[in-house]
Curated annotation (Swiss-Prot):
GO CC terms of this entry: cytosolic small ribosomal subunit
UniProt xrefs under PROSITE patterns: RIBOSOMAL_S17 (PS00056)
Recorded superkingdom: Bacteria
Homology family: Belongs to the universal ribosomal protein uS17 family.
One GO process term, biological-process aspect: translation
Protein name: Small ribosomal subunit protein uS17
Complex and partners: Part of the 30S ribosomal subunit.
């Protein structure tokens, strides 16, 4: 029991839409999928609050990773900038 293996944490890639808070950014992650019944390509987006330790700015494309709850809304952290 001393050496338990933890599962891989989820990662997502998105664009920073707001960096006005101190050490927190809002990242919009887009998802494109085909509707199962109508076969139309649908574009959907979600916003995630993430801890910013790198000092990213609005418009940057970043990779975020799941983490422990850091505040009421923050459950993700910025891992790296993606070019």
């Amino acid at each position: 029991m001393a050496s338990e293996v933890r599962g891989l944490r989820k990662t997502k890639i998105g664009v920073v839409v707001s960096s006005k808070m101190d050490k927190t950014v809002v990242v919009r992650v887009e998802r494109i999928y085909s509707h199962p019944q109508y076969a139309k390509v649908v574009r959907d987006s979600r916003k995630f609050y993430a801890h910013d330790g790198l000092g990213v700015s609005e418009g940057d494309k970043v990779k975020i990773q799941e983490t422990r709850p850091l505040s009421k809304l923050k459950r993700w952290r910025v891992v790296e900038r993606v070019s």
